């Protein structure tokens, strides 16, 4: 399957409010988070058929990501990204999606200097052995 996964389906710059971080105030006050998803997929059937049934609905990817970011609180954005990746792989057709890249940005991270954002990026392949502990 990996040799067919040269196509990409991306949802970039999704914006949510969440309570993620290790500091006490980060658990109380919502702060902005941005998430990008890049699915490594086989989009040939969808390209030929023009049928939503032959691809992954990016509206459902947005809703799934929103539920995770705006729901449970994580200490680390690494754990948040891993939870999103697991959920995306669980919710998508294994014949279509073989891997997902997740980038989580925290533009209001509690740093003492000027910066644009803090970002974590992960790649999870469906056929990789699970290495994440958090769920």
Language-model-derived ranges and their functions:
Residues 1-135:
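N-terminal, polar/charged subdomain of small-to-medium soluble alpha/beta proteins
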């Amino acid at each position: 399957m990996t040799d067919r996964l040269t196509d990409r389906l991306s949802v970039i710059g999704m914006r949510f409010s969440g309570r993620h971080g290790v500091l006490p105030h980060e658990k109380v006050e919502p702060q902005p988070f941005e998430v990008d998803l890049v699915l490594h997929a086989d989009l040939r059937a969808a390209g030929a058929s023009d049928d939503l049934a032959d691809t992954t609905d990016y509206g459902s990817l947005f809703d799934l990501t929103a539920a995770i970011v705006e729901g449970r609180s994580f200490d680390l954005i690494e754990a948040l990204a891993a939870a999103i990746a697991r959920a995306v792989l669980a919710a998508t057709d294994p014949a279509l999606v073989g891997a997902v890249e997740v980038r989580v940005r925290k533009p209001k991270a509690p740093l003492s200097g000027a910066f644009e954002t803090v970002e974590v990026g992960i790649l999870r392949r469906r056929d990789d052995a699970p290495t994440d502990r958090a769920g």
